[in-house]
A protein has these predicted regions:
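Iron-sulfur-cluster electron-transfer modules
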Residues: 1-139, 144-203
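The first long alpha-helix at the start of the GST-like C-terminal all-alpha domain
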Residues: 205-207
């Protein structure tokens, strides 16, 4: 990235660095902290999803969220699922025999807690085509920590994913990301750039 720029600047990363300086000087904003807790919100949603979804539709609650957290009152938050993709996969029985290929599913926090059907459909299509699917332990890719330039939290969030995914790609598994393009970009581009375990992160990026 940046090669097409006159001065070969990777502008998105330049902005991230600028945000990092701002965060270092002023600290994290409340909405940055809130939006980075995707795994925690997903866990709460698995227990209290219907209640949280109902409350999020109340205009006065959205008004308070706008004033306190900084999430615009007209912004509709994605609904939380009580049956997470992780729960579904644990109970899922694969019928694949003699697979033609094998993949490790990186579900993303969005697929796990919000759009579970997306993950289910991906697995069903892959298995229909005789592809073995595994879903190892994982957490949010860490992208929400990059927006404010919180590199320490990003590394803390991403390192366990790298260690786990590396085990599988070393066995010949390919990575399938089900979820927002930001998550794919994070694994492919941000992990190699921002994490110190460069060999493992690069292997994941190429898978």
């Amino acid at each position: 990235p940046g090669k097409e720029h006159e001065f070969e600047l990777d502008f998105p990363k330049l902005m991230t660095r600028a945000q990092a300086i701002r965060t270092k000087d002023r600290g994290l904003k409340l909405n940055d902290i809130f939006l980075s807790k995707t795994d925690l919100l997903g866990t709460l949603g698995s227990y209290f999803g219907p209640l949280i979804n109902f409350v999020n539709r109340i205009s006065i609650v959205r008004w308070f969220m706008d004033k306190i957290i900084g999430i615009h009152k007209d912004r509709k938050l994605p609904e939380l699922a009580t049956l997470t993709f992780e729960k579904w996969f644990k109970n899922h029985k694969s019928v694949v025999q003699d697979p033609i290929d094998k993949v490790v599913i990186f579900g993303t926090c969005y697929t796990n807690s919000n759009d579970v059907d997306l993950g289910i459909s991906a697995v069903e299509i892959l298995e229909h085509n005789n592809v073995e699917c595994v879903y190892p332990k994982q957490q949010c890719c860490g992208a929400p920590h990059l927006s404010p330039g919180d590199f320490d939290s990003f590394k803390k969030q991403a390192d366990p994913n790298v260690e786990e995914l590396y085990k599988w790609v070393s066995k010949g598994y390919k990575i399938i990301v089900t979820g927002p393009p930001t998550c794919s970009l994070t694994l492919k581009s941000e992990y190699p750039d921002y994490l110190e375990m460069s060999d493992k992160a690069q292997k994941i990026s190429e898978s």
